[in-house]
From Swiss-Prot:
InterPro entries: DUF520 (IPR007551), UPF0234-like_C (IPR035571), UPF0234_N (IPR035570), YajQ-like_sf (IPR036183)
Described function: Nucleotide-binding protein.
Protein name: Nucleotide-binding protein VV1636
Keyword Acyltransferase tagged: no
Record-level GO cellular component terms: cytosol
Family of the protein in this entry: Belongs to the YajQ family.
Keywords for this protein: Nucleotide-binding
Gene Ontology MF term list: nucleotide binding
Amino acid sequence: MPSFDIVSEIDTVELRNAVDNSNRELSTRFDFRNVQASFELVEQTVKVSAEGDFQLKQMRDILRGHLAKRGVDANSMDAKTAEQTGKNWHQDIVFLQGIETPMAKKIVKLIKDAKLKVQASIQGDKVRVTGKKRDDLQETIAAIRTAELGQPFQFNNFRD
């Protein structure tokens, strides 16, 4: 029986490239002259630090633009609240990876509500979808792509 997996992953190499490009842009921008501002990537978290809250917002927009250029979906960003320590502001931006159980249940419910002839099962941090026909699986992929679930999904391990 044909099957595929629904996963939510971030390409860490592209994430690192986007952070490096964002740091390069900070060094050339006029409005960030003589300002201590930087992006730092630690595992799946980008630590943003600047001298003002307004600059943090600008830096998030810079990062979002570079993520889009590198093909990383910005919907996977989860920006924590900004904290002020002394004259500097810090913010952690966590990139979500994997499908949490509540989101996996939403996906399974979405597939069942679409009345497609496929079965969906939750397997850890991914959802496996199996069906008799390849066309049913492709309809399932289309249904999930059109649904606004607030997280980017990839479809891999497609088997006939």
